């Protein structure tokens, strides 16, 4: 339950989690959040909703870093305490914490501070590199396109694996084949008009898969310019 914005700003977020869990056919419900909504009261409701995993995406390890990168005044120490509280009541909830290397000052040990601070409070913890997914946007500090989010050499792909295991549903019901399609150039259906199974098995997505398999992703303008497929997907 996440795409282009902060999911927990949606007043119906917890209801969405409960609805998804009540179906009984979903392996995992998760979200990625900046964690600004966390705190006593909300934390209990979050755990009670049955959500399986949250990924906390943070902007640094001090209030000063947040002001520099996120341009907001942020009480970092208070945030850590809110995460600590969530961890203490989490039950089966998995908590992952990530940040990007470009937001840490390695010369003064902020990478170590990140691990020391969140390591005891998380089931998974990651420092990622910024990778440019969209040629329309300049990303300051992004690693070279031949290096992935973890500094490994990328393997060029001719077929995007997203097409065969995922869909991305926007807030208005428009369905894209992947989360990178932020401007919906590849819209393949609308849940207000047809079921998700009909879209998954539909002609538009089938044709897109065919283009990738037989011509390569470069034959699709939106896919050919994508950086994420090479740096952020598995074979």
Where are these predicted regions, by residue range?
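Short, acidic, Ser/Thr-enriched surface-loop or helix-capping motifs
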Residues: 170
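Short, small/polar residue-rich loop motifs at catalytic or cofactor-binding pockets
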Residues: 161-163
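Flexible glycine/acidic-rich beta-alpha junction loops that bind and position SAM and/or redox cofactors
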Residues: 103-106, 126-145, 182-185
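Short, solvent-exposed coil/turn elements at secondary-structure transition points
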Residues: 35, 101-103, 130-133, 181, ...
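Flexible mid-to-C-terminal extensions adjoining Fe-S/redox cofactors in radical SAM and related proteins
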Residues: 174-175, 179-235
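Acidic, low-complexity intrinsically disordered segments
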Residues: 137-159, 186-203, 207
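Radical SAM/AdoMet-radical enzyme domain recognition
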Residues: 1-124, 128
């Amino acid at each position: 339950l996440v795409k282009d914005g902060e999911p927990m700003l949606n007043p119906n977020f917890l209801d969405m989690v409960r609805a998804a869990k009540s179906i009984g056919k979903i392996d995992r419900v998760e979200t990625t959040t900046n964690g600004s909504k966390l705190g006593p009261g909300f934390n209990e409701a979050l755990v009670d909703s049955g959500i399986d995993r949250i990924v906390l995406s943070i902007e640094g390890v001090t209030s000063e870093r947040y002001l520099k990168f996120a341009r907001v005044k942020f009480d970092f120490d208070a945030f850590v305490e809110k995460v600590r509280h969530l961890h203490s009541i989490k039950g089966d909830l998995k908590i992952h914490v990530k940040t990007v290397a470009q937001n840490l000052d390695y010369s003064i040990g902020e990478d170590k501070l990140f691990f020391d601070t969140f390591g005891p409070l998380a089931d998974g913890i990651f420092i990622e590199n910024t990778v440019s997914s969209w040629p329309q946007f300049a990303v300051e500090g992004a690693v070279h396109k031949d290096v992935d989010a973890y500094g490994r050499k990328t393997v060029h792909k001719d077929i995007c694996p997203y097409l065969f295991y995922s869909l991305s549903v926007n807030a208005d019901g428009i369905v894209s084949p992947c989360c990178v399609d932020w401007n919906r150039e590849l819209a393949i259906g609308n849940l207000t008009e047809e079921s998700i199974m009909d879209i998954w098995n539909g002609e538009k997505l089938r044709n897109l898969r065919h283009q990738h398999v037989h011509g390569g992703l470069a034959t699709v303008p939106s896919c050919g310019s994508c950086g994420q497929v090479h740096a952020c997907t598995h074979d």
